[in-house]
Amino acid sequence: MYNGILPVYKERGLTSHDVVFKLRKILKTKKIGHTGTLDPEVAGVLPVCIGNATRVSDYVMDMGKAYEATVSIGRSTTTEDQTGDTLETKGVHSADFNKDDIDRLLESFKGIIEQIPPMYSSVKVNGKKLYEYARNNETVERPKRKVNIKDIGRISELDFKENECHFKIRVICGKGTYIRTLATDIGVKLGFPAHMSKLTRIESGGFVLKDSLTLEQIKELHEQDSLQNKLFPLEYGLKGLPSIKIKDSHIKKRILNGQKFNKNEFDNKIKDQIVFIDGDSEKVLAIYMVHPTKESEIKPKKVFN
């Protein structure tokens, strides 16, 4: 039985669910879950939690992501990416803008921004996914969402051809960010229709492309009984949270029994959630949170016996 976090390289054409389904067959275990959906046409890092590590999948999702995308100015689509039907075209020429204009524009997207999610997305409105409305040719008001663009920059020259302009960007962002919406919004600010023509996730949950294995590689390693060495411990998925190392055996016992604590029993300031780590084994003991009605107390959220 495997336990840990496995960074998978999801190839284009597969859904995130396909990856989980195939892994369950390869590894012969049902206790597998991914950490955030990647669209079928997007390749890149998809961390998968196996065994006990499924309990930390939410925390892996919260750790942020990085992408490399191609923005295509001059044509918009129904899906905001290359898979959709054309909505609008407007010829783009090298006299319309230059790379300095693009760089200044990209700077304006840094920080907390508002996005309207694409109609072809899994965001739910009134209990129904937006893509379900879109497939039925129904329109529905989409809620604006705040997302965090930690960094964004151009990583290629501008390529003007066939009345369009293409360039690559790298984006570091928080969860819930739609890069294809970012591409269309870049076009709006330039005064042109636009879409995202290619996307690769280069980092997710602290895992990068070089950490990631294809399904074929995973199958081979499993057959050679050497896959466990490639799994990251579940503690890795909690590195985005503050932690305290516990040496005292009495306190360890209280934590594992799920007892409440007063904040002032610890030297560290506890603002929201805290991970207790066994000071001897370096294994996670529990995740605690501030008590919702008693600010001076912390209570267990997840205990790892």
UniProtKB/Swiss-Prot annotation:
Molecular-function GO terms, alphabetical: RNA binding; tRNA pseudouridine(55) synthase activity
Domain of life: Bacteria
Biological process annotations from GO: mRNA pseudouridine synthesis; tRNA pseudouridine synthesis
Enzyme Commission code(s) on record: 5.4.99.25
Catalysis performed (reactions): uridine(55) in tRNA = pseudouridine(55) in tRNA
Disulfide-linked positions: none
Leading EC class: isomerase
Keywords attached to this entry: Isomerase, tRNA processing
Active site: 39 (nucleophile)
HAMAP family assigned: TruB_bact
Role of this protein: Responsible for synthesis of pseudouridine from uracil-55 in the psi GC loop of transfer RNAs.
UniProt record similarity statement: Belongs to the pseudouridine synthase TruB family. Type 1 subfamily.
The protein, known as: tRNA pseudouridine synthase B
Native source organism of the sequence: Staphylococcus aureus (strain MW2)
Lineage: Bacteria, Bacillati, Bacillota, Bacilli, Bacillales
